[in-house]
Amino acid sequence: MGPFEPVTLASAEAASTRYVGFERHPFPRCFTCGPERDAGDGLRIFPGQVEGRPDGTVAAPWRPHSTLAGPDGVVAAPVVWASLDCPTGFTVMTADADVPPYVLARFAVRIDAPVPADRDYVVMGWSLGDDGRKHLAASALFDEQGVTVARASALWIQLRA
C-alpha cells in the first residue's frame, strides 16, 4: 500500500482510540490534538496507529465544525494547515515519559481542493525517516470518496533530554 492510500473512516475511528496523546501529551491544550480541549473547542484530531500499516502510520477522523468555515462553507486555509500538523508529529511521538518530545521545525502544505465544513474526512500521517534528532513525516487529508484534498510534509526536532 502506498502512503497516500487512505484508510476507511471506520479504520480511522479505530486508530484514533490508540492515540498516545491520551496517555501522555507534551501540549495537552494543543488546538489540533489536545485531549484537554472540549468538543467545539479546537479540532480534536487524535491520530493513532493504523493496524496493518507500518509503524508510524497514524489516522484519525475529522468532521470540521461550521464555525471553522467562511461564509462560503469552506474551512479556512490556516485550519486545514492545522489539521495536517499534529498527524505528522504523532508518527514518532510515544507515551514513554523517558522519551523527550518533538517540536515542529518546518512545515509545508498544499491544499488541492476546498474543504467544506460539516463533512467527514480522514487525516493520515506517516513517517518518512529519521536523521539523529530530526524526524521527517508527511500527512494528507482525504474526503469521503478517498480523494486527497490537502497534503503536507514536516520536519520535527526532538528536544534534548
Regions found by a protein language model. Name each.
Residues 1-32, 115-117, 126-161:
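HotDog/MaoC-like acyl-thioester-processing domains
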Residues 1-74:
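Non-catalytic linker/capping segments at the edges of enzyme domains
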Residues 61-63, 108-110, 124-126, 140, ...:
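Residue-level recognition of well-ordered beta-strand positions that form the cores
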Residues 64-66, 86, 113, 158-160:
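Non-catalytic surface loops within mature trypsin-like serine protease
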Residues 74-83:
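Short, conserved micro-motifs enriched in small and acidic residues
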Residues 81, 87-123, 135:
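Hydrophobic beta-strand-centered segment that forms part of the acyl-chain substrate-binding groove
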